Amino acid sequence: CIGAGATAGSGGIGPAAVLACAQSGGLDREGMVKALVTASAIGIIIGSRATVSGAEGGCQAECGAAAAMGAAAVTEMLGGSPEAAFHAAAMALKNVLGLTCDPVAGLVEIPCIKRNASGAMNALLSADLALAGVKSYIPFDEVVAAMYAIGKAVPQSVRETAKGGLAVTPTGMRLRHGNNKGEEK
């Protein structure tokens, strides 16, 4: 079974959360397949009602969608209800509302790699909260709508153009022009 991630730039989030959960809980292949189906459903909802593109919605759309997908998948894997999976997805997405997409030198490396790590932790935390009975008072579909509205409102410079945010810091500009002394990875 193949479950597509939200985007290449956020592609490590869902798999990291699902694999960490599967390895620590000794879950089987069938459980992982169900989790991927759940993740895919969340991704389809976000993609059809908003966007998963950093160029259109910022990193909140890319990493937020991937974290929401991962959170719902982990909730499914650990026996949570569909309602709990939606709460987990909503919480994961809410945690990154407003996050810009500001790739240094226009490459999907800095800060993307670290955002994948924090996105995986966001997914696991949100699943844990939902499984503990914590609910998102803002329903998932409304969180998705809010993310889309925020994405349209943020400046184009922080929507995958490498013209704002970390991309235009002095170090970001040095990296863009190939003057890197000790690359961060």
Task: Place the predicted regions along the sequence by residue.
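Acidic-glycine-rich active-site phosphate/pyrophosphate-binding loop
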Residues: 31-51, 95-103
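Glycine-rich phosphate/ribose-binding loops and adjacent secondary-structure elements
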Residues: 40-43, 49, 56, 62-67
